[in-house]
């Protein structure tokens, strides 16, 4: 292997590393954005769950609020 071949290989490796660095940065940005979205979804799910629980408990009538059956 002569110097020219080594230089070409070095250039190829540097190019691959630069491409990989750019790809890693893009992936990091995507992961960061997804984490933000996951946090928002978790908060929204928490709110919906709380509302659902409160609406279910308000839909249940207390026994003393129930009208007696017709045979009473």
Curated annotation (Swiss-Prot):
Coiled coil (residue ranges): none
InterPro entries referenced in this protein's UniProt entry, alphabetically: SlyX
UniProt-annotated stretches for the region Disordered: 53-72
Gene3D superfamilies, per the entry: 1.20.5.300
Pfam families, sorted: SlyX
UniProt xrefs under PANTHER family: PROTEIN SLYX (PTHR36508:SF1)
Family listed: Belongs to the SlyX family.
UniProt-recorded name of the protein: Protein SlyX
Organism of this sequence: Proteus mirabilis (strain HI4320)
Gene field: slyX
């Amino acid at each position: 292997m002569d110097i020219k071949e080594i230089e070409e290989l070095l250039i190829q490796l540097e190019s691959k590393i630069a491409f990989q660095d750019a790809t890693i940065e893009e992936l990091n940005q995507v992961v960061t954005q997804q984490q933000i979205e996951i946090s928002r979804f978790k908060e929204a799910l928490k709110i919906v769950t709380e509302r659902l629980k409160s609406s279910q408990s308000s839909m249940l009538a207390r026994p003393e609020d129930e009208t007696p059956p017709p045979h009473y």
